[in-house]
Amino acid sequence: MQSPGSKNNSKKRAEKGPAQRLRQRTAILILLILVLGFGAAVLRLTYLTTVQSSELQESAVDLQLADTTVSAKRGTIYDANGNVLAESASVWQVVMSPVNFKNDKQRQAAAKGLSEIFDLEYNDVLDDTKQQSHYVVVKRRIESDEREKVLKLIDTLKKDYSCSGVIQLLDDYKRYYPKNSLASSVIGFTGSDDQGLEGIEYEYDSYLSGTPGRIITAQNARGTDMPFRYEQNVESEDGNNVYLTIDETIQSICEKYMQKGVEDNNVLNKGVCIAMDVNTGAILAMVTTDGYDLNNPYELSAKDKKKIKSTAKSKQAEAESAALSNMWRNKAVADTYMPGSVFKMCVASAALEENLVNEKTSFTCTGSISVEGETIHCSNISGHGTQNFVEVISNSCNPAFIQIGQMLGAGKFRQYYQGFGFSDKTGIDLPGEAEDSFWKEGKMGGVDLAVASFGQNFSITPIQMITACAAVSNGGYVVQPHVVSKITDSKGNVIKTVDKKVKRQVISDDTSKKMNEYLEYNTERQGAAAGYISGYKVAGKTGTTEKRGVTKFESSFSEDYISSFCGYAPADDPQIAMLVFFDTPDGDAYYGSQVSSPVFINIMSEVLPYLDVKTSYTDEELGYVDASAGDYTGVSVDEAKTAVEADGFTATVKGNGSTVISQIPTVSSGLQKGGSIVLYTDSNSQSETVSVPSLIGLSPDEVNDVASAYGLNVSFSGATTSSGTSSSQNIEAGTSVSPGTVITVSFADSSSTLNE
């Protein structure tokens, strides 16, 4: 029998056993958790320090550094002679360091000053002053006048509020186009971020844009910027400079006469002019009329604004976008058109190359031709009768060219179409080049071949046509057109040159020389209607295209046309080719000979002398060659009169002075021999004016006589031969001008016929 004490001890052991075991299990569990947790931590730490080490280091750096981009200076765009067409000028960027403000008065003064200078909302600027940062951009690309205001504000904050180091001016750049709208469709423009959006600015953006710099600012543990002394500046690298093949002088001449052509002929859908070096493919000028100001590329014309305003409000945004796209569009590259009769130079070249024709091959035109039951008319509805191959080209006879196309057949026709480069993009270094539209292989029927033979019912780009024209003239070589000649770095070192690239030879040199001869004959025979320029051998072809295509073979056509002229000079040593076309002339005339040829003549009459192309006058032409006025000022009246007469002119003295103070025409002005030089001896005598007479419809001699009777001078262009008749004058009849003023008169050969 147990004692009471033994019972109590047993009871205590019984009570203690479960509790102790529970505590032991709890301790083991805690220990196990600690071991597993520590093991996981070790494994995680090992993973982080090995596998994710680089990633975490980068993340840590990102948390400690604030990285701000600094603009690079965009490269300059130059013309062929080094004239600046686009440049980035120095402007400034206004930035704040808000954490440097010491009190609300400083913040309020800064916010008030900045909001007034830049016309910003005061509360928005005040909110910026409260940011925990050392770098907040207030305004980008400010110019000198605003910079001066900011400098005054900085000075005021320092003097009146003991606030310094808060506002800074950093270097920035703004794009400028010193020639405004010149070559706008070629150069293009940049956006607000200085990225190229159109033209060369877009195509060569990677070269022009440069490499931005950086401002790296250290941050403290709270995530706010540390003082400026903890900054690191990485300098930006300026962009490269791009040199164009475009010649500013030639471009200006082309734009001047093309715009006049648009106005004179009420052209509804713009005009295009391309001037190209036939041997290298360098584009000397490229014009799409109705250009825009590159410094303000979103400003539409009054005509476009009026049209948009008349549109339903729900459609106005869409209409504005379409109007801008049309304004920026480079029609010379991005649009296609039916070339019409200018394409005949390619068809004729192909037939010659295949020995299917020669200059004596005879064709008969009765005024129409039947093809697979369809009657296709000639522009000369009475017919050209019997004509040889050279006359066929000059007569631009559609029935004869249909026969030539049939001689070639659809297969050979396609072969030369491809050979001249029409089936592929030219590869010109401009954005948005369009593709041609032609019959698929095996799908060209007899009627299709017939109308294609005179340039209808298929579409090509203007740049393709001028490239093919160059191949006709240069020995048959298809050269790739280009508008950039070289690229230099910011120090002037050449890093890239664009060399001549010959794709293929499509016709032989012999065929090319024959075509030069035949197309020159066309110009001589047709006179100003086909690009005749006194003193120069010009080869060329007119074109008048029905825009709807030939779908009904009638003698009457639709009212919408494309008027064109494509030619080159000198014919015996081709250097420059030019295409001129106007889309939908809506004036009194629409034929290429009436609308485009005169513009071609006016442009080439200035461009060829500028390029130092030698003249070669006939004896008859020599009688009407302009002479240049000398400088007759600053000497006595007697001395001036002697010099004037020695130069082959007559002198007319105005005023009572003894010394010549001014003259009309001015120095180097071109005028006919025997013309009158007006010498002024005092300012009072310079107010006299005369009314310009009509000089249209006269022979060269008659024009000289009428101008002389009015005390005016004349300068001649075009067909200045005995059969020439004046067709236009640059100053309208009835205009008041000073005595001695030079009137430029253009002549057409009155013996020529209208052949398109």
Give the location of each predicted region.
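Beta-lactam-recognizing serine transpeptidase/beta-lactamase-like catalytic domain environment
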Residues: 3-5, 86, 220-234, 279-342, ...
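Extracytoplasmic
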Residues: 70-73, 80, 88-91, 133, ...
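Sec-exported extracytoplasmic/periplasmic mature domains
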Residues: 115-119, 155, 191, 209, ...
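Acidic/histidine-enriched alpha-helical segments
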Residues: 124-134, 267-280, 364-366, 430-434, ...
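Ligand-recognition elements built from short beta-strands and adjacent flexible loops
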Residues: 498, 535, 549, 580-756
